[in-house]
Amino acid sequence: MKKVFTTVVLATALSACAGNGPRNNVQKQAKYNELSKCDLDIEFPSQTPKNKREFAKYLSTQARNASADQFVIQKRIEILQMVGWNDSVADAIATCGTNRKNKRKENASNVFEAVKAGTTGADEKHALISAYSAWEAFITSQTPLAKQDFDSKVSYYKNM
């Protein structure tokens, strides 16, 4: 009797699991679609920074936002691992991160060129180029050393 009862309970449990298969696939696909979405709507500054302090603040804000982007990408990859790995979704997540970095660089490049054109002193221009180059390196690599280099160079430029 115990064996029959155990068999019935086990069969019921397995049939219940089998019935959830299609529903789980729909849920999994919905999660894949959500993880694959990419928002490239990165705000361009409403007004171009007019002085070195404003430009330094702009670069620092963009660096912080890029770090937040990297955090979101990492969390999406972790969620993907929990849901079930899918190569095309992983590629979409990685591509989104790259596209967001490139969009930030493109926006900042336009601002940088405008600030550079308005900078007259050779030392200040050198510090500006150095700070912007360190910012680009940090945005690309997101390493602690690159962050330290960026912070140092942008502080020097801002306080000239």
Predicted ranges, named:
Residues S15-A16:
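C-terminal motif of bacterial Sec signal peptides marking the signal peptidase cleavage site
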Residues K2-V8:
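Sec-dependent signal peptide recognition
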Residues A63-Q70, I77, T119, I139-A146, ...:
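Sec/Tat-exported extracytoplasmic proteins
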Residues K2, G19-Q29, Q47-K50, A94-E106, ...:
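Intrinsic low-complexity, intrinsically disordered segments enriched in polar/basic residues
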Residues A11-T12:
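Repetitive helical segments and hydrophobic/amphipathic motifs
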Residues D149-M160:
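Short, low-complexity, Pro/Ser/Thr/Gly-rich segments in the mature regions of secreted, periplasmic
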Residues G21-A92:
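Immediate post-signal-peptide N-terminus of mature secreted/exported proteins
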Residues A92-D149:
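Long, amphipathic, charge-rich alpha-helical segments that form helical bundles/coiled-coils
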